[in-house]
Amino acid sequence: MSEVNSFNINKNNVSQKERVLELAKRDLVSFGQLFLPGDYMKSSPAAYHYELSNLLLDSTKKRNCIILPRGHSKSTLAKTALLYHLYFNPEGKKEFIAWVAEEQSQAIDHIKYMQNHIEINPALNYYFGDLRGSKWTEKEFTTSKGDRVIAKGTSQRLRGRSQLGLRYTKIILDDFESELNTKTPDRRREIKEWVMSTVEPALENSAGNEGSIWLIGTIVHYDSFLQSIYDGYTEATRDERRYAWDVMYHKAIDGDGNVLWSSYFSKQKLADIRRRFEDVGLAHKFAQEYLNEARDLENAKFKTDRLEYYDHEFESKNNYAYLVNSKEAIPVNIYI
């Protein structure tokens, strides 16, 4: 992501350190550019990065569902948001956070990212001080402010856990659904029941400190939990009624050809990726990974593996239809 934007700060009234902290506090992109440049200076940010930043930093949003294409920094922004909260939370506000992935080992990798930056990131240590706590293992860590972060796998036990009387303030379900754990109707039902009967009751419910859930992922099955949340959201939006979840949903490229993150996934790059999927008969997998369209191939009326793709323009001439490019005009016959 590109250079940090300039902000309207009176440089004569604040120290250099205060200016940096004020910049970092504005949004997750600025925080990342200043303190996590390895991840945030590779490409210019897109509008959706700021949209996601606003969602994850809004303390009034307690049920967030973030559905983004593969490779579009959703997990990176979520980890950045947790670091932001750990460093900027006011004195006395403690976090008890569970990062949940499909397998616990995957969740461990994500909290290791946070541990590494807390431990050895010189900029964070200079501006905020040492945040390391007394417990520092691969599966969990604490901070010097009394926060606790643990790694869990999908379907693992969450209820009954607390940190000094505090139940979970945030539970992050990151890529918790996969093609493997959503293969059968029973497994899909088990995941839905686990979220509602295990994850939900594990949250802190004290007034003013209610816990939140972040669902983060790409839709992997048409009957997945993420898909059901999105379907409910679209119905509620259509009917103009309130919905329990705040939903953020994007495709890598929309129906009008607009690219979500043009500086990193250009239209040509996405076309090349699509072609590689098509060349091995997996066009539906591109739709799943980059368009968040998980399809029921067995019952689909139009089979994606039977589709043929043409780089032509559609033209109508003398009551006949053609697919036309610079080399040829192919007649198109439509039978209804």
List where the protein language model places each region.
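Conserved nucleotide-state-sensing and coupling region of NTP-binding domains
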Residues: 100-155
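ATPase catalytic-site recognition across NTP-hydrolyzing enzymes
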Residues: 257-336
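Walker A/P-loop NTP-binding motif
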Residues: 78-91
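A short acidic (Asp/Glu
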Residues: 76-79, 108-112, 223-230
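Walker A/P-loop
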Residues: 61-81
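ASCE P-loop NTPase helicase motor core
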Residues: 183-258
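Conserved RecA-like ASCE ATPase "motif II neighborhood" in helicase/translocase motors
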Residues: 138-198
